[in-house]
């Protein structure tokens, strides 16, 4: 599915097609436009064949066109929602140009629409240039997954195709970009040795220090199956 809401339940039941979501007042609408991602995170639900076949966020019929996404949106009044979030199974900025086109069209109709991006923070490496000027004025919040306080552990977790350079590029090129609001979100993974749903406090403190040095916000949330 392309447009969905989050129910608060665990697993696949936590995602609900917007057509089945009922009253959208005060809710976030999530936009899922691609399966593509430059990482292969060990904690990601998309890693198992079962999830890829059965999870409703997996775009089995290919990526929706800009026109198809806008047609879905045309059925709903976005004045009543809380926030629009580009998220999903893939990295939204793998379709940077298309995402921007969708936002531009929606903001022509809803100029006060709040828009957030959930990203792994690799767009500059994906495109080989600084893409942050294209985010300015379109997104109100850019939420970048941090996950770990050092590059080696981060690479072990994300298995990024860009290797070690990925971590530094995210911190010094992605996080420090001139966005109006820059919210760094640390999405924790489950520590299977400790059977815990969040990082140990000492690692969280290191992540807090990284964000403090960068002048950005850290939001810690537990891993969700």
Features from the language model and the residues they span:
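Short acidic/His/Gly/Ser-rich catalytic and metal-binding motifs that mark active-site loops
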Residues: 40, 53, 151-153
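A generic local structural motif
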Residues: 15-17, 71-72, 128-132
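Short Fe-S-cluster ligation motifs
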Residues: 64-89
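Catalytic phosphate/metal-binding cores of nucleic-acid and nucleotide-processing enzymes, i.e., regions
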Residues: 22-26, 55-62, 66, 83, ...
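Short connector loops/turns at beta-strand edges and beta->alpha or beta->beta junctions
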Residues: 38, 49, 147-149
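N-terminal [4Fe-4S]-dependent radical SAM core
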Residues: 1-35, 42-61, 78-80
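Conserved AdoMet/S-adenosylmethionine-binding subsite of the radical SAM
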Residues: 89-225
């Amino acid at each position: 599915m392309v447009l969905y809401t989050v129910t608060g339940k665990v697993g696949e039941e936590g995602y609900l097609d917007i057509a089945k979501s009922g009253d959208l007042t005060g809710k976030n609408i999530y936009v899922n436009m691609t399966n593509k991602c430059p990482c292969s995170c060990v904690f990601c639900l998309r890693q198992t064949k079962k999830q890829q076949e059965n999870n409703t966020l997996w775009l089995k019929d290919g990526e929706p066109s800009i026109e198809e996404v806008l047609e879905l949106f045309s059925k709903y009044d976005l004045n009543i929602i809380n926030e629009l979030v580009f998220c999903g199974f893939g990295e939204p900025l793998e379709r940077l140009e298309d995402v921007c086109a969708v936002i531009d069209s929606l903001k022509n109709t809803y100029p006060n629409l709040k828009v957030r991006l959930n990203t792994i923070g690799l767009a500059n490496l994906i495109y080989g240039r600084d893409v942050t000027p294209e985010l300015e004025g379109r997104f109100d919040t850019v939420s970048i997954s941090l996950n770990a306080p050092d590059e080696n552990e981060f690479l072990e977790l994300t298995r990024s195709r860009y290797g070690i350079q990925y971590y530094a590029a995210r911190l010094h090129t992605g996080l420090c970009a001139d966005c109006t609001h820059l919210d760094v979100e640390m999405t924790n993974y489950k520590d299977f040795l400790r059977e815990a749903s969040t990082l140990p406090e000492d690692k969280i403190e290191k992540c807090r220090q990284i964000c403090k040095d960068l002048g950005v916000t850290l939001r810690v949330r537990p891993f969700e199956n």
